[in-house]
Amino acid sequence: MKEADLITLRRQLHQIPELALQEKETHALLLKTIQGLPQTYLTIRTLPDLPTALLVKVQGRDPQRTIGYRTDIDALPVTEKTGLPFASKHSGIAHACGHDIHMTVALGILSYFAEHQPKDNLIFFFQPAEESKNGGKLAYDMGAFTGDWHIDEFYGLHDRPDLPAGTISTRLGTLFAGTTEINVDLIGKSGHAALPQNANDMIVAAASFISQIQTVVARNVGPTDSAVITFGLMRAGTIRNVIAGRAHLEGTLRGFTQQQIDFLQQRIRDIGQGIAASFNCQVKVALNQGGYYPVENNDKLTKDFIQVMKDDPDVTFVDTKPVMTGEDFGYLLNKIPGTMFWLGVNDPDSQLHAADFSPDEAALVPGVTAVVHFLEHRMLEKV
């Protein structure tokens, strides 16, 4: 695809953002685009139990392995405020995380290999439900990557607004944190504000729970390590002169290794049990990690990726640190070795998930060519 084709396609995708597992228009446009490519080497597959997902296999001429490339396809419940002439047509939904860029780069890579048969097999995975619903985990758990669709190594990108357009960046080890949703219900006894001895105040219990949770990172995580536990929602009480008999908390836990996350999850449960004993109340702690594991890059494959990027005179590569945001590609990289990397899209005054996020389309061609170059290099490596 030429740059003009990529831009046109990106703008079409940008106008039809859809939420997790609802990506019907997006799926249809992707399928139409892929069916318009040369079909000699392609096999297209849909998943009946995950109907907005799409897999495309490119048959290699002398395959020693199968390399996977993944892109996410869903959008966010955000009202777009970019002012672009090709802004979202769907009220209250926008590609505020740049998945339209991700899809366009993937289609550009696929179009190249549809015309230039690769040495190894390639499988492109157009994944629904990254922002929620664990789309990668859903596909893996239903056996999408078994048999003839087995993948030996997996790659994928995420756009990054604070890097110049076309810049590539990644690192050994963890790139994205793993995330866990925290839901806590505290159940005591309501009563008159003037008679606290006859009630069991869950606002006080909830405040104590939150305060104790804040000691977990400070005192259970080493000073050179990183983790975050944040509560962003608390509901309790109905009126000023009635003691709240119930409280509900919602928060998030984020860490850079699964071992650390498992430990912190247990500490949250332990504190919940302690609060229940201290305040003579019920504390129900629900932790949901789903498929949002840390994105941990494979050392061997990532070293190779970084070296290829650094050796490519057409690529600007920069080092990076891990980030506390989450990405469900972590689940797939927990099962299949691979590498995730950043693609700069030059929107430093905005950020991912912002209503005014507007990635620079100048990143499209460099993104496609850098990945094509890497994959062609990778296919020359012996298994």
Curated annotation (Swiss-Prot):
Keywords: Amino-acid biosynthesis, Diaminopimelate biosynthesis, Hydrolase, Lysine biosynthesis. CDD domains: M20_Acy1_YkuR-like. The keyword Hydrolase applies. It holds the Pfam family Peptidase_M20. GO terms for biological process: diaminopimelate biosynthetic process; lysine biosynthetic process via diaminopimelate. Pathway: Amino-acid biosynthesis; L-lysine biosynthesis via DAP pathway; LL-2,6-diaminopimelate from (S)-tetrahydrodipicolinate (acetylase route): step 3/3. Its EC number is 3.5.1.47. InterPro entries: AcetylDAP_deacetylase, Amidohydrolase, Bact_exopeptidase_dim_dom, Peptidase_M20, Peptidase_M20_dimer. It catalyses: N-acetyl-(2S,6S)-2,6-diaminopimelate + H2O = (2S,6S)-2,6-diaminopimelate + acetate. It comes from the Bacteria. The active site is at 72, 131 (proton acceptor). GO terms for molecular function: N-acetyldiaminopimelate deacetylase activity. The keyword Amino-acid biosynthesis applies. Catalyzes the conversion of N-acetyl-diaminopimelate to diaminopimelate and acetate. Belongs to the peptidase M20A family. N-acetyldiaminopimelate deacetylase subfamily. HAMAP family: DapEL (MF_01692). PANTHER family: N-ACETYLDIAMINOPIMELATE DEACETYLASE (PTHR11014:SF98), PEPTIDASE M20 FAMILY MEMBER (PTHR11014). This is N-acetyldiaminopimelate deacetylase.
